[in-house]
């Protein structure tokens, strides 16, 4: 399932490898925090020519960077970034329609840290994403804490995920035992098929 060499291991790469071993080509994929577009591009490659990828971000420069990256890589027929809040995800991926939803919380790399995801909005976005997932679908979230953004978002999302009913979801939290407490934290949520 995971084929990384230790020097290449990051929280984002781990989440990507876990998704790559889980999802199948085709279907609907959502990058709920598209940033510079690297996760959106990753999802386009997973989705393949039969799939469709939607990237969401509240910053115009993130949407532009993502759409440029997709075009440069010939993926603009598969994926598109849209200027929208991740809490509004259900407008673009109705309930039960998404195979995969990916979050990489925090701030836009290379931009001012004054604009970053917030606890209340992030929990609402995760709740919407879980509703958007098909049974058998998967959500990934990389959570951050630190000097700039504090701990509230990471803790709020973790608390929400840990409270999900086991009858409907399996939650995987990948802690790196010898990394700093503020290190990025990859999490995966598998939505169980009905009757399992």
For each feature predicted by the language model, list its residue ranges.
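S-adenosyl-L-methionine
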Residues: 1-28, 38-41, 45, 64-95
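Mobile active-site "lid"/loop adjacent to the S-adenosyl-L-methionine
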Residues: 102-125
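A short acidic, Gly/Pro-enriched loop at the edge of an enzyme's catalytic core
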Residues: 27, 91-100
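Conserved beta-strand signature within the Rossmann-like core of class I S-adenosyl-L-methionine
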Residues: 33, 136-143
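Helix-to-beta-strand junctions that scaffold the AdoMet/dcAdoMet cofactor pocket
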Residues: 24, 47-48, 133-135
């Amino acid at each position: 399932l995971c084929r990384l060499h230790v020097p290449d291991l990051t929280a984002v790469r781990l989440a990507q490898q876990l998704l790559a071993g889980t999802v199948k080509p085709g279907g609907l994929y959502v990058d709920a925090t598209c940033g510079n577009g690297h996760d959106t591009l990753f999802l386009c490659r997973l989705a393949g020519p039969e799939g469709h990828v939607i990237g969401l971000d509240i910053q115009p420069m993130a949407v532009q960077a993502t759409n440029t990256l997709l075009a440069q890589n010939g993926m603009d027929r598969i994926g598109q970034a849209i200027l929208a809040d991740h809490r509004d995800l259900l407008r673009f991926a109705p309930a039960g329609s998404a195979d995969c939803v990916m979050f990489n919380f925090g701030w836009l790399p290379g931009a001012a840290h004054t604009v970053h995801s917030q606890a209340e909005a992030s929990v609402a976005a995760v709740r919407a994403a879980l509703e958007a997932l098909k049974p058998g679908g998967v959500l990934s979230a990389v959570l951050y804490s630190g000097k700039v953004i504090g701990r509230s978002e990471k803790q709020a999302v973790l608390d929400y995920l840990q409270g999900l009913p086991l009858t409907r979801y399996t939650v995987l939290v990948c802690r790196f035992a010898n990394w700093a407490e503020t290190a990025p934290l990859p999490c995966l949520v598998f939505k169980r098929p009905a009757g399992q």
